[in-house]
């Protein structure tokens, strides 16, 4: 059958304002989370007018309990009240990444190579924004995903959202 084709998406820097807001929130909140003894798995900020949501995903060996989320929520709320990086109203959510954990960093993508993933891009590539397939790994700044018999190299900066698809085998 031969080698499967490889497609490469060149990154276009859309959503820079959102990205810099996320970077600002990450820089502010990651030290708080880590100072409490947790790993800051990732942060999502979804701005939807009056219904904006700030999600902080935390993890630790042995898993996360409700008390862990509560402790991080209290500390994060305090620092957010003082620093006020979000001018509009928002809801703060703190949770574990869960079974369908979101992936944010190249290291997270690399550590979950071999698993099924669902990836949504910020803008279409090859006429599509959604990719579901086997996570092959990473190459430099690209996430490699195999959909059917095709490999796609997707720059991490072009990914809007990515999640593991849980396996119940």
From Swiss-Prot:
One of its GO terms (cellular component) is cytosol. It is found in: Cytoplasm. GO terms for biological process: ribosomal small subunit assembly; translation. Its main location: cytoplasm. InterPro entries: Ribosome_maturation_RimP (IPR003728), RimP_C (IPR028998), RimP_C_sf (IPR036847), RimP_N (IPR028989), RimP_N_sf (IPR035956). Keywords: Cytoplasm, Ribosome biogenesis. The keyword Acetylation does not apply. Required for maturation of 30S ribosomal subunits. Belongs to the RimP family. This is Ribosome maturation factor RimP. The lineage of its organism: Bacteria, Pseudomonadati, Pseudomonadota, Gammaproteobacteria, Pseudomonadales.
